[in-house]
């Protein structure tokens, strides 16, 4: 209703193939680059976590540890104002490496064709077994209860807006969740050796996430403080309309530059 989407909720194999054709080669290369590195890290992480053992504490009394992957994981991928392709890679890839049997991804429809093609392409590449054209509260509820002939998930991962966060809070206990995520924020500690342009750009990069995203700079160098305070409004003006509409109030209401003696 709210997405004004009337197509199929479950993304078919044909639609997955269509999505792949809509993604340009540069974006595909970037997705593969990120996927391979996240996968490599997850594989090494698993190798160091997977320490199964048994020990006989006393005669006939045996204790041990086994790490067993859960059966089903739901990966929520934000896609409202921005296509969070990285969320698809970071959520699905570790679950696949861990050996989760069924991975269900959900992302809100971008238009009448469903979720963003880049998100669908990345989710499929990383190993999602099912992809849903579904966002927000409806997606979280559907993943939890298994509303589209898919099994209810055991665990939910993935960020979202305040409504997604509240849905996860309400369902916590019925389903496992990763965390209660609030607005994105950034705090940078910098001295005179810092690259002033990168400091300013990093703060703006977080401020554009939402009107309530704080950004702080803590520095001992006045030239860094002065440059960043002058440069951030300039960078915000260069943003497209949507990100600028978020970054301006975020910096105005929640931005701070703290100049310290030591």
What feature does the model see in each segment?
Residues 125-214:
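Conserved NAD(P)+-binding/catalytic subdomain of aldehyde/semialdehyde dehydrogenases
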Residues 101-110, 215-222, 228:
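Short internal beta-strands
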Residues 1-71:
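N-terminal Rossmann-like NAD(P)+-binding subdomain of aldehyde/semialdehyde dehydrogenases
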Residues 55-121:
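Conserved small-residue-rich beta-alpha loop and adjacent elements
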Residues 217-262:
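NAD(P)-dependent aldehyde/semialdehyde dehydrogenase
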Residues 16, 20, 24-38, 66, ...:
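Generic structural signal for well-ordered, non-membrane alpha-helical segments
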Residues 30-33, 37-40, 72, 90, ...:
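Alpha-helical scaffold segments in soluble metabolic enzymes
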